[in-house]
Structures are given as C-alpha cells and as structure tokens.
Amino acid sequence: MAATDVRPKITLACQECKHRNYITRKNRRNTPDRLELRKYCPNCRTHREHRETR
C-alpha cells in the first residue's frame, strides 16, 4: 500500500556534500518531478540546493 501512496516520504540531500539532511512528504500528483529546495545544510553551514533522493 505504501507504493501507491499519494504523499510518500522523501529525503532531501545537499548537492554539495551529499548529506541527507531533511525528510518531508510531497504530493506526487502536483509535483511528479524531483523536488529541489534551497535549505540550510548543517554540514556546509550555509544555505544550499537540496534535491530529492530515492
């Protein structure tokens, strides 16, 4: 049942250091592509681009 979930849990990883810093949910119907957000990376200690990982 989790495979057909409309709002699955996704992980956001920093593009610079590749650390997985955030876990969130997204609506698959509204955003079918990979999610990209600018969030704070505690490892880099600055705001960086975070991309959805699988």
Curated annotation (Swiss-Prot):
GO cellular component entries: cytoplasm; ribonucleoprotein complex; ribosome
One function term, GO molecular function aspect: structural constituent of ribosome
Keywords: Ribonucleoprotein, Ribosomal protein
InterPro entries from the UniProt entry: Ribosomal_bL33 (IPR001705), Ribosomal_bL33_CS (IPR018264), Ribosomal_bL33_sf (IPR038584), Ribosomal_zn-bd (IPR011332)
PANTHER family, per database record: 50S RIBOSOMAL PROTEIN L33, CHLOROPLASTIC, LARGE RIBOSOMAL SUBUNIT PROTEIN BL33C
Entry's family note: Belongs to the bacterial ribosomal protein bL33 family.
Protein's recorded name: Large ribosomal subunit protein bL33
Organism: Thermobifida fusca (strain YX)
